[in-house]
Amino acid sequence: MRALLAAAVFILTPAAFADPAEDFAALIADYEAHEAARDVIRRGRRGDLEAASVWPDASFEAVAAHDRAMAGFLERLEAIDPDALPDDQAANYAVLAYQLESAAAIPASRAALTPFTNDSGFHTRPDFVALGTRLRTVEQAEAWIARIEALPEYFAQHRAWLERGLERRITQPRDILPGVADQIEAQIVAPEESTLFTPLAGLPDSIPDEERARLRAAALEAIETRALPALRELHAFFVEDYIPGARESLGARDLPGGAAYYRDLVRYH
């Protein structure tokens, strides 16, 4: 019996006297790793070719998994006594607490219902990414072409959230939506005029002429057969379904649960 008690004490003691500083450092490392893993745009810019060939995963499953992860991080943070941390970690604790509490108050699954404003959003992100993309190798160019080809799924994921928002009566105000539809329509241009083609227009001379021609032709085909049809479908959805079904009021307070949502917006944004 004494041996069992001794073993129990030996097992429980490390957990009972866990170092808050070590727990906090591990939490920060896990949080940063989680954020880095899901930020495929940044990873792509840093040379990760697999990340450079896809868009952020906005599927229901991925967003729900992110919300669960953030809730888990907050639970771990709340188990750490900030007064037990070194003085130089107080600011880090406060910043992380703000970020995680904000994510709990306004989870990604709520924000995903209205993933745009009157001037930008998921629908403009591909063009912004294109303008910030510099291709230096054949492999980078092929990754960008793959990313263009992935646009239908990217738009479909966000459309699914917009449809869910319509079902729940959580939409952006109708007054701003014609301008958003115009932004989408403005992207429906000839492939060679598309902002998505911009990275291919600046391919370096270090890539042989024949290869540059091949890559540009592949990009133009991807824009013609993948990006433009997806943009046309998205525009039609906005005009035919989203705008007619959107709320007429302007204030966030008028949304279901709007008073609490407005309070959280004021507090965390």
Predicted feature locations:
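N-terminal maturation segment of proteins
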Residues: 18-269
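Sec-dependent N-terminal signal peptides
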Residues: 3-12
